[in-house]
Swiss-Prot record:
It is found in: Cell inner membrane. Belongs to the PlsY family. GO terms for cellular component: plasma membrane. One of its GO terms (biological process) is phospholipid biosynthetic process. The keyword Lipid biosynthesis applies. Pathway: Lipid metabolism; phospholipid metabolism. NCBIfam families: glycerol-3-phosphate 1-O-acyltransferase PlsY. This is Glycerol-3-phosphate acyltransferase. Pfam families: G3P_acyltransf (PF02660). One of its GO terms (molecular function) is acyl-phosphate glycerol-3-phosphate acyltransferase activity. Keywords: Cell inner membrane, Cell membrane, Lipid biosynthesis, Lipid metabolism, Membrane, Phospholipid biosynthesis, Phospholipid metabolism, Transferase, Transmembrane, Transmembrane helix. It comes from Vibrio cholerae serotype O1 (strain ATCC 39315 / El Tor Inaba N16961).
Amino acid sequence: MTPLALSMIIFAYLLGSISSAVLICRVLRLPDPRNVGSQNPGATNVLRIGGKKAAVAVLLCDMLKGTIPVWGGYFLNIEPFMLGLVAIAACLGHMYPIFFHFKGGKGVATALGAIAPIGLDLTAMVMATWLVVVVLFRYSSLAALVTVLLAPLYTWLIKPQYTLPVAMLCCLIVLRHHQNVKRLFAGTEPKVGEKNKKPSDDEESRVV
C-alpha cells in the first residue's frame, strides 16, 4: 500500500464520519435521528421525521461522502483494489463515525456515491434497480439488498476491472443489513412510509 492510497483511505473514513443526517437535522431544528423513528441517521429516517426536502439533502450529502474520495483516488491513478478500500473506508466512516460516537447509518447512499465514479451507466442501473424494488415491494431494505447483490454483475458487464472492489463494498452493505434480513424473513420489516406502531419499533434499523 502506497502512502497516497493510505492517505486517501484515512481521508475517506474521516469524511464518511461526518453525519449528514445529524447535522442537517440540527440546522433544521429537527429531532436527532439517532433518538427517534428507527434511530438510524440516514435519509430514510430523516424522511420520516423531517419530510422530503430534508431527506433529499441527507441523501445527496451521504452520496458525496462516497463519491469525493473515490473520484479523487480515481484521478490520482490509485489501483482498483485500493479504490475498493477507499470506498469501504468511506462507508465504515458512515456506519461507525468517529465524530458521532460510532453510531451511524447503513451506508447504502454512501456506497452508491462510491460506485458513481465508475460510470453514469452503472449508477443509472443501480439506482433503477433500487427504485423498481421499492415501488414493487415497498421495502427499502429489500431494495438495498437486491441492488448490492446485482451491483457486482452490473460492474462486470460495464468495467470488469472494478468488479472485485464493488463486490467487497457490497459484502459490507449486506453484513450491515443482517438484522433487516431477519425481519424480512419474519415478516416484521417496516415498509417505506410506515409509521412506528409501538415503542419497540424504535429499535429497528432502516437503510440508507
